[in-house]
Structure formats: structure tokens, C-alpha cells
Design a protein with these regions (language model features):
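Residues at beta-strand starts and edge strands
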Residues: 4, 24, 83-85
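Beta-strand-rich cores of mature extracytoplasmic or soluble domains
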Residues: 62-118
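Sec-dependent signal peptide recognition
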Residues: 2-9
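N-terminal secretory signal peptides
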Residues: 19-69
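Sterically constrained small-residue positions within well-ordered secondary structures
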Residues: 10, 19, 32, 78-80
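Aromatic-enriched hydrophobic runs in primary sequence
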Residues: 5, 37, 48, 89-91
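Residue-level marker of positions within ordered structural domains that often coincide
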Residues: 6, 33, 94
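N-terminal signal peptide c-region/cleavage motif recognized by signal peptidases
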Residues: 14-16
Length: 118
């Protein structure tokens, strides 16, 4: 009797494993919109954006580090939204790609970072 629930669980795991895309390194620009509290990472050269996955759990500190870098000593109420962060980011999408939609992702790494005023 355990075989049927085990097979059902294996099928669920197999189908959900294909729904998530592999990690990729992109050159992007991160911007924090303080009015609505959204942090977006734009893949430069495309129309595609990533946002922190609220349920990704594994690496919230990487997204928090972006906010800290964007603030860069600014103490104004709009701190963080006055700058943009350019660099190379390793993003791991947690939902399948949909054209025209922001894709939730976890952030596994960053390099070649540069803060630029907007």
C-alpha cells in the first residue's frame, strides 16, 4: 500500500523540479523603488526583471546586501532609491519564465559591483 503514495510523491517532485530554471549569471542593474518597497534586478539588454522570492528562504542576505549597497551612507527617507547598483549577479529563478512578467529568484552571488547615482 505504500507504493501508491510513494509514486505520487515522486511524480510531484519530478514535475516541480522542471518548473524551476537553472541558475544563471547575468549583467544587471538593481534598483529599489522606495515608494512601493520593490527591489528589482533588470537583466541588461533584455526586457526581463527579477525580484526577491519571498519564499526562497535560502539567501535573503544577498538581497539585503543590495539594499545596503544602494543606501551607501544616504540617510534620507528615500535612501536606496537614489542609486542604482550595476554588476554581475548569479540568479536562480524559482518560478518558470513568463514573457512580460517579473520572475522571482534567489540571489546566489554578486561581483564587479558599482553604485551609480540615478
Amino acid at each position: 500500500m505504500r507504493i501508491l503514495p510513494t509514486l505520487a510523491a515522486l511524480l510531484l517532485v519530478a514535475t516541480s523540479a522542471h518548473a524551476v530554471e537553472p541558475c544563471q549569471t547575468i549583467h544587471g542593474r538593481a534598483i529599489y523603488y522606495s515608494a512601493d518597497g520593490q527591489l528589482r534586478l533588470w537583466h541588461i539588454g533584455t526586457h526581463h526583471e527579477f525580484q526577491p522570492d519571498a519564499y526562497g528562504g535560502a539567501t535573503p542576505n544577498q538581497w539585503d546586501k543590495i539594499i545596503t549597497l544602494l543606501k551607501a551612507g544616504d540617510t534620507s527617507p528615500a535612501a536606496g532609491s537614489n542609486n542604482a547598483l550595476h554588476g554581475d549577479f548569479v540568479v536562480c529563478p524559482t518560478k518558470p519564465y513568463r514573457q512580460g512578467a517579473v520572475q522571482p529568484a534567489t540571489l546566489q552571488g554578486m561581483s564587479h559591483l558599482r553604485v551609480v547615482p540615478r
